């Protein structure tokens, strides 16, 4: 492939804006890197575990969760269960650290006690938030221009007047991606 008379090398893995994109459309390398970074930051939090619960909660959200959340809506819906559980395990270890809970404490109880959401639910909410910003013109015009045009010519009395025309796609990966269908 050529661009501006220069040959573009084909690669199997490319890091773009901190996100690893693979030619096979899997996110293994991305999850490996996210877990590695999050675990490093979690180990730093362990050294200050004597701070109050509120302080540890804020530190977790600033350091560890920000690493997990970066680009999460982009790939979360296409993750394998094993990859998603790796992210959930990082959050579970952080919840045990923040609360001082014992080893076999229920993940759901810890999340409920702290007011945290599961990684999957957080991804869905972040994705909805991003889509709302795009839809309500709170993003740059370039991003808004990538969205399909609303179907203005709808003559029927339906709840979704002015809704988006769905993309035509054939793959399961695209169907589960961030983009609305």
Task: Identify the meaning behind each predicted range.
Residues 1-181:
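Hydrophobic/basic alpha-helical segments
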């Amino acid at each position: 492939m050529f661009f501006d008379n220069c040959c573009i090398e084909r690669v199997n893995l490319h890091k773009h804006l901190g996100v690893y994109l693979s030619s096979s459309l899997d996110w293994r390398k991305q999850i490996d890197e996210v877990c590695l970074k999050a675990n490093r930051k979690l180990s730093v939090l362990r050294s200050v575990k004597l701070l109050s619960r509120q302080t540890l909660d804020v530190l977790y959200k600033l350091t560890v969760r920000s690493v997990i959340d970066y680009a999460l809506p982009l790939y979360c819906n296409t993750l394998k269960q094993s990859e998603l559980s790796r992210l959930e395990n990082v959050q579970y270890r952080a919840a045990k650290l923040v609360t001082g809970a014992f080893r076999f404490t229920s993940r759901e109880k810890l999340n409920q006690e702290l007011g945290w959401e599961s990684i999957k639910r957080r991804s869905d909410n972040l994705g909805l938030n991003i889509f709302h910003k795009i839809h309500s013109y709170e993003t740059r015009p370039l991003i808004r221009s990538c969205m399909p045009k609303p179907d203005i010519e709808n003559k029927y009395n339906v709840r979704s007047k002015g809704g988006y025309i769905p993309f035509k796609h054939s793959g399961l990966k695209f169907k589960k991606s961030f983009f609305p269908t």
